[in-house]
Amino acid sequence: MDKKASRIRRATRARRKIAELGATRLVVHRTPRHVYAQVISANGSEVIAAASTVEKAIREQVKNTGNVDAAKAVGKAVAERALEKGVASVAFDRSGFQYHGRVAALAESAREAGLKF
């Protein structure tokens, strides 16, 4: 099993558990160049809020779109957008990525901006 298949397996297991809880989830995805975050409804059919370093507003705030500072900006933006829509509590879905570096920075930034998880 290669590295990507292992990550997807971990992500599937976590998503199954979150679905059992019936919680709205904050999903994180990262590539070497960008960081993406979405708040998805409990049934998985609706994206409530989203933010990424691909967006012009966030891209202009940071020098590099693939680092910890960019992840912090994305976390803050997605939390603010979720709170505007009335979502204050989420389950954190790290998509099988290790809770370290950019993933952890995004989570901490979202917590500081007011999301609870």
UniProtKB/Swiss-Prot annotation:
| Listed GO biological process terms | translation
Q: What name does the UniProt record give this protein?
A: Large ribosomal subunit protein uL18
Explain the purpose of this protein.
Answer: This is one of the proteins that bind and probably mediate the attachment of the 5S RNA into the large ribosomal subunit, where it forms part of the central protuberance.
GO MF term (any one): 5S rRNA binding
Quaternary structure and partners: Part of the 50S ribosomal subunit; part of the 5S rRNA/L5/L18/L25 subcomplex. Contacts the 5S and 23S rRNAs.
Similarity annotation: Belongs to the universal ribosomal protein uL18 family.
One Pfam family for this entry, by name? Answer: Ribosomal_L18p
- Tell me which GO cellular component terms the UniProt record holds: cytosolic large ribosomal subunit
NCBIfam families listed in its UniProt record: L18_bact
Q: Which InterPro entries does UniProt cross-reference here? A: Ribosomal_uL18_bac-type, Ribosomal_uL18_bac/euk
- PANTHER family the UniProt entry points to: 39S RIBOSOMAL PROTEIN L18, MITOCHONDRIAL (PTHR12899), LARGE RIBOSOMAL SUBUNIT PROTEIN UL18M (PTHR12899:SF3)
UniProt keyword terms in alphabetical order: Ribonucleoprotein, Ribosomal protein, RNA-binding, rRNA-binding
